């Protein structure tokens, strides 16, 4: 029997407000434990919440960017549960009347077709504190308590780990581009839970659902979904009963581990938040926020393909972050060579950034300097291989490519006469190569080119070297 997985994601994004959702405490990351707190976010008796208007602005902005309907009237609710990181013993969230509903994101499948993943709702809520487990016991840091979140709940429209990862990547790029969240998964400002079930292929009835937590990267999400799908199928095939439960992803061992049985909505005893009024929104307010939404990543990618004639794949990679997209666009315009700009950013520069765990906005050089490097190569001043050495030096020092080329004497040798002398000497020193070429071994040409480039320390123009090697070898063959 063939099975298929049914996947939905619940994504929490911390909003980029300067203060918390119901008080004036800072949302800055990394403060000493329990220093960004007050009676409101600690839930002390007599303290009353006052909703931060910026939270509503950002929630609506996210909803519009994600093709949602905006509810003209929505309400805050109390979600009741007892846990050490929840100081009030309830969380202020939204239940029946979320601020946004019925949106979607389009992802691209491997075959090039587009698939629409529905967004059921977006609601605003406050974050909980953070538990720190030590050998001596468990400590609680309430700095994060009251930090504003939006929870984006997808419909169960995904059917593979790759689709889930692509959905999350696209969601992240949209939220970051409209600047409602910095979406730093490593700092916990973007967190994802996956709901997974498995059913026989073609069946309409959904299987027993498991919720997976603790996935802090796109790769973790893919691995966790793949593992949990496999676990469900194996249990079904053995005839064992699946439990509706919450599990966590164990990154070290690449498995999911049971945490608790999955709660139902009535376990939380939702009821309206009595200390806050309803959120009422009119069309003028929505239109004002709509006007602040910039060009979205998928729109920018489509424009890049049309304007710069780069492949769709390049455009999709370059627009994953706005910083990379802007760096590419400026470089392409300054250099006049969009494909070279794309190749450098997606190739050597991305490799260097990944090795140092850096983002493009941390580069020591700018688009003007990268365009200068591209022009040095296109003009024949330096070779592409020398360019790779230059870009590493730019990455490490921030120096301009012209300065690096002059300081290190890297100007390409285009003197055909001088190169010919080296070519003839290399051929004279390697008579066996001529014999091999006569016997049909064309690879020796590359061997001889390599020797010439080594002799000239990479400075000889490789096009001239290739031409002269071919001419001289064919004379002798």
Curated annotation (Swiss-Prot):
Q: GO MF terms on file?
A: asparaginyl-tRNA synthase (glutamine-hydrolyzing) activity; ATP binding; glutaminyl-tRNA synthase (glutamine-hydrolyzing) activity
Kindly indicate whether the keyword Nucleotide-binding belongs to this entry: yes
- Catalysis: reaction(s): L-glutamyl-tRNA(Gln) + L-glutamine + ATP + H2O = L-glutaminyl-tRNA(Gln) + L-glutamate + ADP + phosphate + H(+); L-aspartyl-tRNA(Asn) + L-glutamine + ATP + H2O = L-asparaginyl-tRNA(Asn) + L-glutamate + ADP + phosphate + 2 H(+)
Cite the PROSITE patterns for this sequence: GATB
EC assignment: 6.3.5.-
Q: Which InterPro entries match?
A: Asn/Gln-tRNA_amidoTrfase_suB/E, Asn/Gln-tRNA_Trfase_suB/E_cat, Asn/Gln_amidotransferase, Asn/Gln_tRNA_amidoTrase-B-like, GatB, GatB_C_1, GatB_Yqey_C_2, Gln-tRNA_amidoTrfase_suB_CS
What keywords does the record list, in alphabetical order? ATP-binding, Ligase, Nucleotide-binding, Protein biosynthesis
Q: State the Gene Ontology BP annotations.
A: glutaminyl-tRNAGln biosynthesis via transamidation; translation
Main role?
Allows the formation of correctly charged Asn-tRNA(Asn) or Gln-tRNA(Gln) through the transamidation of misacylated Asp-tRNA(Asn) or Glu-tRNA(Gln) in organisms which lack either or both of asparaginyl-tRNA or glutaminyl-tRNA synthetases. The reaction takes place in the presence of glutamine and ATP through an activated phospho-Asp-tRNA(Asn) or phospho-Glu-tRNA(Gln).
Q: Per the similarity annotation, which family is this?
A: Belongs to the GatB/GatE family. GatB subfamily.
Q: How does it assemble?
A: Heterotrimer of A, B and C subunits.
**Can you name this protein?**
Aspartyl/glutamyl-tRNA(Asn/Gln) amidotransferase subunit B
């Amino acid at each position: 029997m063939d099975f298929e997985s049914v996947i939905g994601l619940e994504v929490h994004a911390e909003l980029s407000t300067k203060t918390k959702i119901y008080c004036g405490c800072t949302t800055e990351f990394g403060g000493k434990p329990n220093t960004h707190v007050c009676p409101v976010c600690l839930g002390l008796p007599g303290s009353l919440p006052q909703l931060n208007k910026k939270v509503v602005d950002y929630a609506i902005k996210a909803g519009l960017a994600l093709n949602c309907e905006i509810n003209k009237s929505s309400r805050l609710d109390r979600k009741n549960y007892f846990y050490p990181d929840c100081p009030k013993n309830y969380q202020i969230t939204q239940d029946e009347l979320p601020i946004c509903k019925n949106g979607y994101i389009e992802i691209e499948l491997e075959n090039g077709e587009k698939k629409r993943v529905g967004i059921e709702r977006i609601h605003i809520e406050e974050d909980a504190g953070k538990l720190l487990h030590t050998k001596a016991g468990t400590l609680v840091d309430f700095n994060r308590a009251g930090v504003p979140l939006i929870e984006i709940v997808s419909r169960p429209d995904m059917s593979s780990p790759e689709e889930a990862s692509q959905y999350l990547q696209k969601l992240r790029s949209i939220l970051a581009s409209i600047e409602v969240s910095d979406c730093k998964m490593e700092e916990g400002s973007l967190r994802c839970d996956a709901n997974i079930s498995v059913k026989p292929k073609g069946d309409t009835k959904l299987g027993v659902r498991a919720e997976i937590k603790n996935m802090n990267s796109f790769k973790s999400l893919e691995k966790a979904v793949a593992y949990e799908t496999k676990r469900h199928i194996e249990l079904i095939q053995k005839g064992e009963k699946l439990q509706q439960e919450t599990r966590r992803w164990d990154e070290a061992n690449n498995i999911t581990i049971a945490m608790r049985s999955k709660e139902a909505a009535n376990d939380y005893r939702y009821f309206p938040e009595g200390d806050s009024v309803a959120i009422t929104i009119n069309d003028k307010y929505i239109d004002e926020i709509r006007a602040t939404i910039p060009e979205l990543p998928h729109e920018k990618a489509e424009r890049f393909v049309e304007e710069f004639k780069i492949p769709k794949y390049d455009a999709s990679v370059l627009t994953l972050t706005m910083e990379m997209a802007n760096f590419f666009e400026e470089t392409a315009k300054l250099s006049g060579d969009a494909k070279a700009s794309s190749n450098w950013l997606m190739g050597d520069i991305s490799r260097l950034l990944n090795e140092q765990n850096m983002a493009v906005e941390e580069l020591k050089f700018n688009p003007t300097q990268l365009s200068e490097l591209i022009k040095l190569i296109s003009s024949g001043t330096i070779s592409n291989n020398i360019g790779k050495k230059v870009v590493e030096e730019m990455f490490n020092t921030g120096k301009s490519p012209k300065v690096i080329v002059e300081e290190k004497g890297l100007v390409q040798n285009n003197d055909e006469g001088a190169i010919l002398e080296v070519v003839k000497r290399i051929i004279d020193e390697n008579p066996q190569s001529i014999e091999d070429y006569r016997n049909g071994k064309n690879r020796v040409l590359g061997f001889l080119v390599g020797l010439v480039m080594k002799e000239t320390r990479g400075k000889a123009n490789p096009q001239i070297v290739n031409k002269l090697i071919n001419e001289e070898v064919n004379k002798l063959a």
